[in-house]
Amino acid sequence: MGSLTTNIVLAVAVVAALVGGGSCGPPKVPPGPNITTNYNAPWLPARATWYGQPYGSGSTDNGGACGIKNVNLPPYNGMISCGNVPIFKDGRGCGSCYEVKCEQPAACSKQPVTVFITDMNYEPISAYHFDFSGKAFGAMACPGKETELRKAGIIDMQFRRVRCKYPGGQKVTFHVEKGSNPNYLAVLVKFVADDGDVIQMDLQEAGLPAWRPMKLSWGAIWRMDTATPLKAPFSIRVTTESGKSLIAKDVIPVNWMPDAIYVSNVQFY
């Protein structure tokens, strides 16, 4: 009889745990709707965290899930952030820009600063979640209060989408990824002004009129797989989220190499 009673108690406990979620951690918050190119949208609430070194640019390799490297250097200058699902958008949010600010705790300056999305973080702590580099998180603080703000760990914040601006003369830039060859071309795109993010890239081979759609590989990297060798130089058409397009004519030359950077002469201005 005692065994039966014990089994009943255990069964009730299991059901209660299932009904209650069976978890001691914080509740998981579903992601919000995707952020679009509505630049007149009001400020939205989010939660902010930070990672890496206190004054650093996030990842130890100065990169992230977009594939963009050296984010510690200009023009990013370490002012970068991971975005959750509706911000990162499986890589199609890479390069987009946001004004961010906080009002509490007291160390917050309440003044907006601009960050670039170069990484992802899917921790379900808020409908919108920015996981900043240490430098970017501290930039929301009053002067001299950066360390105090970082000690807060997780804070409430506000954000809004803004157009990306780069220093004068900065053009759309392409990096041919390691492992690329005449039958497999993988290209990272960066320094895209205005919308910042790219929703489609197309490639035109030398001497051919047709544009061939590239596939999003991961992050900000687009690829072309082909059974027949591609003929350089290559022109690349870049289309951003709002539907704007530009063409980088013959941007990847005849003697192109893997792991090489090619700077175009065009920009979304």
UniProtKB/Swiss-Prot annotation:
Record carries keyword Repeat: no
Superkingdom, natural source: Eukaryota
GO cellular component, as recorded: extracellular region; membrane
Cited CDD domains: DPBB_EXPB_N (cd22275)
Main subcellular location of this protein, as a coarse class: secreted
Signal peptide annotation: 1-24
Topology term for the membrane: Peripheral membrane protein
List of glycosylated residues: N34
Domain Expansin-like CBD: 183-264
PANTHER family, per database record: EXPANSIN-B3, EXPANSIN-B9
UniProt record similarity statement: Belongs to the expansin family. Expansin B subfamily.
Name used for this protein in its record: Expansin-B9
Annotated organism of origin: Oryza sativa subsp. japonica (Rice)
Species classification: Eukaryota, Viridiplantae, Streptophyta, Embryophyta, Tracheophyta
